[in-house]
Amino acid sequence: DILAAFRVTPQPGVPPEEAGAAVAAESSTGTWTTVWTDGLTSLDRYKGRCYHIDAVPGEEDQFIAYVAYPLDLFEEGSVTNMLTSIVGNVFGFKALRALRLEDLRIPPAYVKTFQGPPHGIQVERDKLNKYGRPLLGCTIKPKLGLSAKNYGRAVYECLRGGLDFTKDDENVNSQPFMRWRDRFLFCAEAIFKSQAETGEIKGHYLNATAGTCEEMYKRAIFARELGVPIVMHDYLTGGFTANTSLAHYCRDNGLLLHIHXAMHAVIDRQKNHGMHFRVLAKALRMSGGDHIHAGTVVGKLEGERDITLGFVDLLRDDFIEKDRSRGIYFTQDWVSLPGVLXVASGGIHVWHMPALTEIFGDDSVLQFGGGTLGHPWGNAPGAVANRVALEACVQARNEGRDLAVEGNEIIREASKWSPELAAACEVWKEIRFNFKAVDTL
């Protein structure tokens, strides 16, 4: 069975058992009345069952309802169908004040019907020939308004300075100021030029998201013909069907696939209603993507440390034990489905590097947009500062130093022999984003 954990807030006077049973019925075989065609099938075989209810500690009138769905209710290899069944209709139910899907357990038999990520972590490292450290990225800013030529120039400067990747912002598609084909050409030129200068393999996440699947394919095919290593997709606004199609294309044609989660906070930000990001992350691993944005813990965007690390492990690891302290409601066995690199992005800079290296470990992409392009000396020195800070943190960690305790000291030491890093340290020494996380257990 597929198991689901729902956070249920019933209307006043509705017992939790009734609310849990209503959720199970409405998201499987039930409807609002008895119908004569019920007799033509075996409802016992196909109906969802609410098998356990827990009160949520510290919350009045909130319960965790555990529901089991028989596998026969779902089309093989279709995230679209799985989510349509489980969360498609039930969230508008009048008997509920609010409803949130906290977690899913996907059984191995169903996992095996999915291709998953086009390549996965190990294959990506082999393609890039980069091992033993997190990868570095940068979102090109301003996100909108640059011409293709100036955009390509910014890409070149960042890659030349030492970054592994640069990135289209999620809303860069094909607007009047920069059509997609021009952007692809200038970015490809920047990639090959920086590769020739540095001797390292470089990439730029070319956003293939488009208004139709046919147009999306056209952009992905053009990227492959240019010989670039990676494309990008906005998987929630683009849709799971389009994403799975693109992931299959990427595996067949040797392209890596970077996933942006634009619109996720509309779905997952409210604590008592919607769907937790760990469900979106599991759905993405099944649908297919080699990178996905997963919060930073320390930057400008939402994310509590233990919860963030819980779903980061769900993205990367092969087997994850149930651990309610990290928000993991079920043990998940991915039966060798390739892993996804977590991308930390949003309001981070060189002073965050020790914390990011410690929190996310090697299998991650650390993306500094303003933290690269905001350097007072320009884009390339900004990239140099980030690369030096990262290499210093990785070396210190490998020598056995505690990044959580000695992080600032490690950055200060490195800045003595890197003027670019010293300048970056001076610019961002006072920047803080001290807000409490909304998403707590």
UniProtKB/Swiss-Prot annotation:
Its EC number is 4.1.1.39. Binds 1 Mg(2+) ion per subunit. GO terms for cellular component: chloroplast. Keywords: Calvin cycle, Carbon dioxide fixation, Chloroplast, Disulfide bond, Lyase, Magnesium, Metal-binding, Monooxygenase, Oxidoreductase, Photorespiration, Photosynthesis, Plastid. The keyword Chloroplast applies. The modification N6-carboxylysine is found at residue 167. CDD domains: RuBisCO_large_I (cd08212). It catalyses: 2 (2R)-3-phosphoglycerate + 2 H(+) = D-ribulose 1,5-bisphosphate + CO2 + H2O; D-ribulose 1,5-bisphosphate + O2 = 2-phosphoglycolate + (2R)-3-phosphoglycerate + 2 H(+). It is found in: Plastid, Chloroplast. Belongs to the RuBisCO large chain family. Type I subfamily. PANTHER family: RIBULOSE BISPHOSPHATE CARBOXYLASE, RIBULOSE BISPHOSPHATE CARBOXYLASE LARGE CHAIN. Heterohexadecamer of 8 large chains and 8 small chains; disulfide-linked. The disulfide link is formed within the large subunit homodimers. RuBisCO catalyzes two reactions: the carboxylation of D-ribulose 1,5-bisphosphate, the primary event in carbon dioxide fixation, as well as the oxidative fragmentation of the pentose substrate in the photorespiration process. Both reactions occur simultaneously and in competition at the same active site. The basic functional RuBisCO is composed of a large chain homodimer in a 'head-to-tail' conformation. In form I RuBisCO this homodimer is arranged in a barrel-like tetramer with the small subunits forming a tetrameric 'cap' on each end of the 'barrel'. This is Ribulose bisphosphate carboxylase large chain. It comes from Apocynum cannabinum.
